[in-house]
């Protein structure tokens, strides 16, 4: 945990009198997908006005969880998202498992505009998905 960041966030939270934080924009994905997302952002400059889009907390899953909890985050999302067909259903399965083994993660699901999306979206809702992340 970056101690300076931790001190800043803790002071901010305490100044506002907040007992904790809910972070609705955190990403946890299968390791191979997470690494590809990081690689994309590393090379995104030409697509976003030739500026960098750095990822500050590029750590292993357990280290990122420790950082969030150190900031006083009481609940957060996994925000999985597919970038092509035939990804969403298995990402939803991964996210359900992640939420089951990580009680402070709100079960997040996703969908892609593809044939059959309605069935895996319905299954995710029935399984308890509380948040959907979608790129349209």
Give the residues covered by each predicted segment.
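Helix-coil boundary/capping segments in enzymes
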Residues: 1-136
């Amino acid at each position: 945990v970056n101690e300076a960041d931790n001190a800043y966030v803790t002071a901010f939270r305490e100044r506002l009198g907040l007992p904790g934080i809910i972070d609705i924009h955190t990403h946890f994905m299968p390791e191979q997908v997470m690494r590809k997302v990081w690689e994309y952002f590393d090379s995104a400059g030409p697509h976003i006005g030739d500026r960098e889009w750095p990822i500050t907390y590029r750590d292993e899953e357990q280290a990122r969880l420790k950082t969030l909890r150190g900031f006083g985050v009481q609940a957060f999302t996994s925000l999985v998202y597919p970038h092509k067909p035939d990804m969403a259903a298995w990402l939803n399965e991964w996210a359900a498992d992640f939420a089951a083994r990580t009680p402070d993660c709100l079960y997040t699901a996703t969908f892609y505009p593809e044939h059959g999306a309605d069935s895996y979206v319905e299954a995710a809702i029935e399984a308890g998905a509380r948040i959907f992340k979608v790129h349209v």
